[in-house]
Amino acid sequence: MQLPLALCLVCLLVHAAFRVVEGQGWQAFKNDATEIIPELGEYPEPPPELENNKTMNRAENGGRPPHHPFETKDVSEYSCRELHFTRYVTDGPCRSAKPVTELVCSGQCGPARLLPNAIGRGKWWRPSGPDFRCIPDRYRAQRVQLLCPGGAAPRARKVRLVASCKCKRLTRFHNQSELKDFGPEAARPQKGRKPRPRARGAKANQAELENAY
């Protein structure tokens, strides 16, 4: 009689334990691997998507590098450095009473934003293109008075001085002494050239010799 009573007590204890587990839910039940079993019928919510998610494979800025804070919108502008030169105007033995000041376009073309005293801006169409030079752009006329030795009467003369410079590029169609300007007008095809006649082959020459006989 004691054995059946003990079995009944064990069954009651096991039943009570299962009741307690069902009351607390499956989350309180752990298996041997110490893994929490999720509740049946419920699915874990997906993690919220970050607004500024940079791990996604998305093209940002149109596939271009981000805008540099020091770069201006018009970074294609290039200009010459302003160089002043003072000289006397001479005409034979006569020389001007006062020196004249003009610009010398011998500087190297560079970004206009980096040149504080830049003049005459041009467009840099291709950074890896041909060579660029700084050449005179506009001139101004100035009248100077020349003094001649020997007590001769002074005389006036009009000279042309450089007023501004600009950047021009060398092209592969010209040598380095010829410069080409920017813009769509620079890409004009050369007119007046006739196509070269094709050289005749040896077979054509042989046929003409046979017909000559």
UniProtKB/Swiss-Prot annotation:
Pfam families: Sclerostin. Its main location: secreted. Disulfide bonds join C80-C134, C94-C148, C105-C165, C109-C167. Glycans are attached at N53, N175. Residues 82-172 form the CTCK domain. Residues 190-201 have a biased composition (Basic residues). One of its GO terms (biological process) is Wnt signaling pathway. It comes from the Eukaryota. Keywords: Disulfide bond, Extracellular matrix, Glycoprotein, Heparin-binding, Secreted, Signal, Wnt signaling pathway. It is found in: Secreted, Extracellular space, Extracellular matrix. Residues 41-71, 178-213 are annotated as: Disordered. Residues 1-23 form the signal peptide. One of its GO terms (molecular function) is heparin binding. One of its GO terms (cellular component) is extracellular space. Belongs to the sclerostin family. PANTHER family: SCLEROSTIN, SCLEROSTIN-RELATED. Negative regulator of bone growth that acts through inhibition of Wnt signaling and bone formation. Interacts with LRP4 (via the extracellular domain); the interaction facilitates the inhibition of Wnt signaling. Interacts with LRP5 (via the first two YWTD-EGF repeat domains); the interaction inhibits Wnt-mediated signaling. Interacts with LRP6. This is Sclerostin. It comes from Chlorocebus aethiops (Green monkey). The gene is SOST.
